[in-house]
């Protein structure tokens, strides 16, 4: 913005319209004296030339050089159907999902529908579907207390397969839908700082923590339904 508070684009509009303003003012003054152009009085021609130029300058001032819509004026134009932008309901729901998860609003079924997990079966013997709003990497003590006995077979097979790639004692595996500890268990063990959001359903999380590693820590997500346990390398 210039020191005189005039947008350069607005100044360009004034320069282009100044010709119409000058001739419109001259015709208006001549028409007030009774002069005519043939049978047409100049008093009718002058305002017809001058008023559009004044309107163009006013519009350029309101829109900051025709770069944006005015804030308070021309509200009726925005309400026209041609100016309305359709909003995708799915995008709106996905945008609202993180705030709902952080604030705790909405039931587990509603959050499952928003995350696209409505058609997948839930675990047996659990009243609610635990969402991955605050799934954290457990310590070895928490892992022993929060294990689900119904998935021992698949877990043991996966653990044996991963033993060849991860040193013993450096990896922790658990399902994303395991039951969490109760309230009195959480008070004894503080929650880790890092949290993982929207973990895929029925997936295995492998986290490695090495003291001398330059990469500090990393986690891998493995889908049990899509994994083949013959000749694969998991990075």
From Swiss-Prot:
| InterPro entries, A to Z | TMEM215
Record keywords: Transmembrane helix included? yes
Primary residence: membrane
Q: Membrane topology type, per the record?
A: Multi-pass membrane protein
Intracellular or extracellular location(s)? Membrane
Record-annotated membrane-spanning stretches: 12-32, 40-60
Lineage top rank: taxon: Eukaryota
**Is the Transmembrane keyword given for this protein?**
yes
Q: Which key words tag this protein in UniProt? A: Membrane, Transmembrane, Transmembrane helix
Q: Which cellular components does GO assign to this protein?
A: membrane
Region annotation (Disordered) ranges: 99-158
- The protein, known as: Transmembrane protein 215
